[in-house]
Amino acid sequence: MGLKCLYKENGDSVTILRCYGEYGRIVLPESINGKKVTELGDYIFSEDMRHKPEGKIWTENGTSEERCADENTAACGSRVREICLPSTIKKIGRYAFYNCYSLKKLAMFSTAVDIGAGAFNGCRQIDELTIG
């Protein structure tokens, strides 16, 4: 199964709310349906998401689905080892990477100027942080 993202549109931009896939390396897209991905939602990669947000599903092959992805394949917690954020990201939501114990590598850009409270709480294994 390839990467799937639960997202919502905010006018001319997109917020990714949750990711799904059965592998530890996640490369987020720069755009979905022609709109720039500018935000990561609260608890996006955390196993402790309080409630599942509403949105549409985008798939890696470029299609959109209306149905919800299976939460058992959510890319969260110890399943996540490496994340590459696109240069279009401006905001990282609260507790976005909360308790991602196995996260070792994070690549992001200096365009991410709004990082929510507790975004990296519990990320004890990060040994490579790349900021472009």
Each language-model region and where it sits:
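Structural signature of tandem-repeat unit edges
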Residues: 2-12, 20-38, 50-91, 101-114, ...
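Consensus positions within tandem repeat domains that build extended binding/scaffold surfaces
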Residues: 43, 93-96, 116-121
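Short secondary-structure subsegments characteristic of cysteine-rich extracellular domains
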Residues: 44, 48-49
